[in-house]
Amino acid sequence: MIRILGEGKGSKLLENLKEKLEEIVKKEIGDVHVNVILVSEDEIKELNQQFRGQDLPTDVLTFPLMEEDVYGEIYVCPLIVEENAREFNNTFEKELLEVVIHGILHLAGYDHEFEDRNSKEMFEKQKKYVEEVWGEWRSNPSEDSDPGKR
């Protein structure tokens, strides 16, 4: 199960994609609870400094908790996601989907920073899942698919 916490840009989109994201979690990790938390630039910068020693904001941070009620948390900064989308010539929606799937794969044990051996597999899976979910969502958007509401 996925809980979307925090409000603002991207929250409605994630709610609309929740079922598909839950399928990925179940396939990669199992029947666990994951929180996706939307945070400000200041909040993610503070977390990045505290846990990674990097004094700058980032788009996504993943924390495996492996507790009974919550397996892990994925912190996402919509503002940085939006900046990255512009930089990579991507839409905000697709970039948001990419970072959440990226976080799910980190919770599943994939690592691209310290383990080259599963980096390639991680990014291949990420691309596959993004294309599957994005393609399905684009061909069947919900009533709340107005970008201004996402």
From Swiss-Prot:
Family stated for the protein in its record: Belongs to the endoribonuclease YbeY family.
Positions of Zn(2+) binding: 102, 106, 112
GO cellular component: cytoplasm
Described purpose of this protein according to its UniProt entry: Single strand-specific metallo-endoribonuclease involved in late-stage 70S ribosome quality control and in maturation of the 3' terminus of the 16S rRNA.
Molecular function terms, GO-annotated: metalloendopeptidase activity; RNA endonuclease activity; zinc ion binding
Subcellular localization, as worded in the UniProt entry: Cytoplasm
Protein name as catalogued: Endoribonuclease YbeY
Named cofactor requirement(s): Zn(2+)
Biological process annotations from GO: rRNA processing
InterPro entries found in the cross-reference section: MetalPrtase_cat_dom_sf_prd (IPR023091), YbeY (IPR002036), YbeY_CS (IPR020549)
SUPFAM superfamilies according to UniProt: Metalloproteases ('zincins'), catalytic domain (SSF55486)
Paired cysteines (S-S): none
Entry EC no(s): 3.1.-.-
Principal location listed in the UniProt entry: cytoplasm
Gene3D superfamilies in alphabetical order: Metalloproteases ('zincins'), catalytic domain
Keyword field contains Hydrolase: yes
One Pfam family in the UniProt entry: YbeY
Cofactor comment: Binds 1 zinc ion.
Keyword terms: Cytoplasm, Endonuclease, Hydrolase, Metal-binding, Nuclease, Ribosome biogenesis, rRNA processing, Zinc
